[in-house]
UniProtKB/Swiss-Prot annotation:
Location of this chain's protein in the cell: Cytoplasm
Claim: Thylakoid is one of the keywords in the record: no
Binding-site positions, substrate: 65-67, 84-85
UniProt-recorded name of the protein: NADPH-dependent 7-cyano-7-deazaguanine reductase
PANTHER family noted in UniProt: NADPH-DEPENDENT 7-CYANO-7-DEAZAGUANINE REDUCTASE
Active-site residue numbers: 43, 50
Its job: Catalyzes the NADPH-dependent reduction of 7-cyano-7-deazaguanine (preQ0) to 7-aminomethyl-7-deazaguanine (preQ1).
Enzyme class: oxidoreductase
Source species, domain of life: Bacteria
GO biological process entries: queuosine biosynthetic process; tRNA modification
Intrachain disulfide bonds: none
Length: 129
């Protein structure tokens, strides 16, 4: 059997790292909202694919996330066996550690499977309303 040559997109996703850029307006509080509607990962129990929309809201301090790096990094989850809760928390923690924002919220809105719809919300304050 021949070894399959990786496509350029697979290579880019494989080596993806989150990148921080300087905030152009650190003197001001402003909200950045990012939606990633094509998030996928694999159920650690069944191996079936899970699909979600990942919503990220944050008030930056010194840094903002570079969007292409975020897109490629989020795509790294597509072949990982990881629960909804673990995926959402990992995304939150990676962004929090990288950016150290004034506020951060990550929401994993997972498509229903087996008639169950799961929304996981992680945020840097205690207002979960």
């Amino acid at each position: 059997m021949e070894a399959k040559e990786k496509k350029y997109g697979e290579i880019e996703i494989e080596k993806a790292q989150l990148e921080a850029w300087p905030n152009p307006n650190p003197e001001r509080d402003y909200m950045i909202e990012i939606t990633f509607p094509e998030f996928t990962c694999l159920c650690p129990r069944s191996g079936y694919p899970d699909f979600a929309t990942i919503k990220i809201r944050y008030i930056p301090d010194k840094y903002i996330v570079e969007l292409k790096s975020l897109k490629l990094w989020l795509n790294k989850f597509r072949n990982r066996y990881i629960s909804h809760e673990a995926a959402t928390n990992e995304i939150y923690q990676a962004l929090y550690d990288l950016l150290k924002p004034r506020f951060l919220e990550v929401v994993g809105d997972f498509h229903p499977r087996g008639n169950v719809h799961t929304v996981v919300r992680v945020r840097s304050d205690e207002n979960y309303g």
